[in-house]
A protein has these predicted regions:
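Non-catalytic terminal accessory segments
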Residues: 1-121
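Membrane-embedded segments
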Residues: 118-124, 129-148
Length: 148
């Protein structure tokens, strides 16, 4: 296989683990349940194959679309919060119960904020005038659009 094909597949595999699996493995370990290497490999492979199928086929299956896009959102937020808690735990002595509490006290409000913020799209109309512009021109500038 060519490198142009292999590199995106490797990136998707790493992405699948870091976004979908790793944060929840860490949370699981904080709850006292460690995951085996076999569980990690199987769950990462499952997520990888679902994401690969979705991105390659552009499937319109609502369940797969929900799994991929909502999973990316929840997983990314979880990854950043878990990473932040792990960094803090190197500096301060925090037990597992406190880590779980910090995670949920941060995660739930951020998810609620993100949900409501996504529903509130802002539209601004700007008018420019200049002596060198003779024709009336209209254009649209779309910024930070996540189509899904």
């Amino acid at each position: 296989m060519r490198l142009q094909v292999i590199i995106p597949l490797i990136i998707l595999l790493i992405f699948s683990y870091l976004i979908f699996i790793f944060p929840f493995e860490v949370i699981s370990s904080w709850l006292g349940r460690s995951t085996s290497l076999q569980e990690t490999i199987l769950s990462t492979a499952f997520v990888y194959l679902v994401c690969l199928y979705y991105f390659r086929s552009k499937s319109s299956n609502k369940i797969i679309k929900l799994f991929v896009y909502e999973g990316i959102g929840i997983g990314t937020l979880s990854l950043f919060i878990v990473f932040f808690i792990l960094l803090i735990s190197f500096i301060l002595n925090i037990n597992e119960a406190q880590k779980i509490f910090i995670f949920f006290i941060t995660f739930i409000p951020l998810i609620i904020y993100g949900f409501f913020n996504a529903k509130n799209v802002s539209v601004k109309q700007l008018k420019f005038s200049h002596s060198k512009i003779k024709k009336k021109i209209k254009f649209i500038f779309l910024s930070d659009i996540h189509i899904g």
